């Protein structure tokens, strides 16, 4: 098998979104799974729209999710001389020509064609022009598209695709200012980089016949194509920012783990048996672009949160502390190692994101200044206050290094007072945490420690 060489080639006109990241991951997996090469190319030929910040954000996103590319990043803006050489080659071989048609003439032609209910297109009037060029017109360069031919290719996702060249006009490969067009620079770079397989969004499918015309004109080897359907929202519509089409780095800020995001995106458009959870190593062992789905996939926050919760639960306390560094939460330095481990173990089971985990740390470690009203109103204060006073005395003698001892202290009150567990546990939870839900009470007592637990009960009794 020949060496697999893939690439990801974004335009730095905006931040990298999840559709682009998914395409990059597919290309990365295919190359790495076959011990091939994966390149990053920045398509920055549109100098008026380029953003250095956007280019840097693409690189930052790659670093975050762990996509390592081979060699140096290729910037198209530094390769204009190379493109000009190949444009000149086509001109010299009479495979391309200068077109002196002005914009006004082209607009008028299109209006006439529309009036005749024809498809607006250039009419090839300068294809075989041998006369004197009109003055004051900076020409564009157009490729001579072969006529009456069928361009066919077997797309790895879409299947057999055929287009008659008569449906194509002689499209522009260099603008009047000499800058090359997108379709031209793409095929030159793919050929010179030795790209064997192109995995990209199916919005590029219509470009492929034109690119094949150029591959053939320059005698370049045509790569294999895989055109992946776009990601839709849960209503089957194009993704909006509200539905997930946002900067990839926003997901890091929202508290998603890179492993979860990669797993989620790969499953949006690719499947392997009935498996849902994939480590990067498993993806490298299983991924084959032949298994890419031909139908659009739907973005689901519920699915992403489920996957992220799975990966969160499997993180060690030490790793979680590292991952939590970008987020703001209460100081943990007063906790001993056992308390810290217990805190993170308890809360990671109840959190879907790192951001949510950070908030839950605050919910436990910041003493309540007010109490959940609907729970507080249901309390029988005449019954509860003496019980909490008695339990406070029990806690002063309890061994806080042993969770079972703390649990026994709670059950002692319940048994001695002959009350239902909920009648005591609910107000105790309210006193310790300020609300009716949260982590287990023996966990809360162990994490807070004797002094803080007693203090919180005393504050509750004062209210």
Swiss-Prot record:
Source domain of life: Bacteria
CC terms in the record's Gene Ontology section: cytosol
Binding site for ATP: 241
Disulfide bonds: none
Residue ranges crossing the lipid bilayer per the database entry: none
Pfam family, one: Anticodon_2
InterPro entries listed in its UniProt record: aa-tRNA-synth_I_cd-bd, aa-tRNA-synth_I_codon-bd_sub2, aa-tRNA-synth_I_CS, aa_tRNA-synth_I_cd-bd_sf, Glu-tRNA-ligase_bac/mito, Glu/Gln-tRNA-synth, Glu/Gln-tRNA-synth_Ib_cat-dom, GluQ/Sye
Recorded catalytic activity of this chain's protein: tRNA(Glu) + L-glutamate + ATP = L-glutamyl-tRNA(Glu) + AMP + diphosphate
Motif 'KMSKS' region location, chain numbering: 238-242
Keywords: Aminoacyl-tRNA synthetase, ATP-binding, Cytoplasm, Ligase, Nucleotide-binding, Protein biosynthesis
The keyword Nucleotide-binding is annotated on this UniProt entry: yes
Subunit relationships: Monomer.
Homology family: Belongs to the class-I aminoacyl-tRNA synthetase family. Glutamate--tRNA ligase type 1 subfamily.
General function of this protein: Catalyzes the attachment of glutamate to tRNA(Glu) in a two-step reaction: glutamate is first activated by ATP to form Glu-AMP and then transferred to the acceptor end of tRNA(Glu).
Name of the protein described by the UniProt record: Glutamate--tRNA ligase 1
Species assigned in the record: Helicobacter pylori (strain G27)
């Amino acid at each position: 098998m020949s060496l697999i060489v893939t690439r990801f080639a974004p335009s730095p006109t905006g931040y990298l979104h999840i559709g682009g990241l998914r395409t990059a991951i597919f290309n990365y997996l295919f190359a790495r799974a076959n011990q091939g090469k994966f390149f990053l190319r920045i398509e920055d030929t549109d100098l008026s729209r380029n953003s250095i910040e956007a280019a840097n954000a693409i690189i930052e996103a790659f670093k975050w999710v762990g996509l390592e590319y081979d060699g140096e990043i290729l910037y198209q803006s530094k390769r204009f001389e190379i493109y000009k050489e190949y444009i000149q080659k086509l001109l010299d071989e009479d495979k391309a020509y200068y077109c002196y048609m002005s914009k006004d003439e082209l607009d008028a032609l299109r209006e006439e064609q529309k009036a005749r209910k024809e498809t607006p297109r250039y009419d090839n009037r300068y294809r075989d022009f041998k006369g004197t060029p009109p003055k004051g017109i900076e020409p564009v360069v157009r490729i001579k598209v072969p006529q009456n031919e069928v361009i066919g290719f077997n797309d790895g996702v879409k299947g057999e695709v055929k287009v008659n060249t008569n449906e194509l006009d002689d499209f522009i490969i260099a603008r009047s200012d000499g800058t090359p067009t997108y379709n031209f620079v793409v095929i030159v770079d793919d050929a010179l980089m030795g790209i064997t397989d192109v995995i990209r969004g199916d919005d590029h499918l219509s470009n492929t016949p034109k690119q094949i015309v150029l591959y053939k004109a320059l005698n370049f080897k045509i790569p294999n194509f895989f055109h992946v359907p776009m990601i839709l929202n849960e209503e089957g519509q194009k993704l909006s920012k509200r539905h997930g089409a946002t900067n990839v780095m926003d997901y890091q800020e929202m508290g998603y783990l890179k492993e979860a995001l990669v797993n989620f995106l790969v499953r949006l458009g690719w499947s392997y048996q009935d498996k849902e959870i994939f480590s990067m190593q498993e993806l490298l062992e299983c991924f084959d672009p032949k298994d890419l789905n031909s139908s659009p996939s739907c973005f689901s926050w519920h699915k992403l949160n489920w996957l992220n919760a799975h990966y969160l639960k499997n993180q060690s306390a030490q790793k979680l502390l590292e991952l939590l560094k970008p987020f703001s939460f209460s100081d943990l330095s007063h906790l001993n190692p056992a308390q810290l481990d217990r805190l993170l173990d308890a809360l990671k089971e109840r959190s879907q994101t790192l951001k949510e985990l950070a908030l839950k740390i605050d919910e436990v470690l910041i003493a309540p200044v007010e109490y959940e009203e609907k729970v507080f109103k249901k309390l029988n204060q005449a019954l509860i206050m003496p019980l909490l006073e008695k339990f406070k005395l029990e806690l002063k003698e309890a061994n806080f290094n042993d969770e079972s001892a703390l649990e026994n202290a709670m059950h002692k009150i319940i048994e001695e007072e002959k009350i239902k567990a909920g009648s005591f546990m609910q107000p105790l939870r309210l006193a310790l945490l300020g609300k009716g839900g949260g982590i287990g009470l023996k966990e809360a007592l162990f994490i807070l420690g004797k002094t803080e637990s007693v203090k919180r009960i005393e504050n509750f009794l004062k209210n």
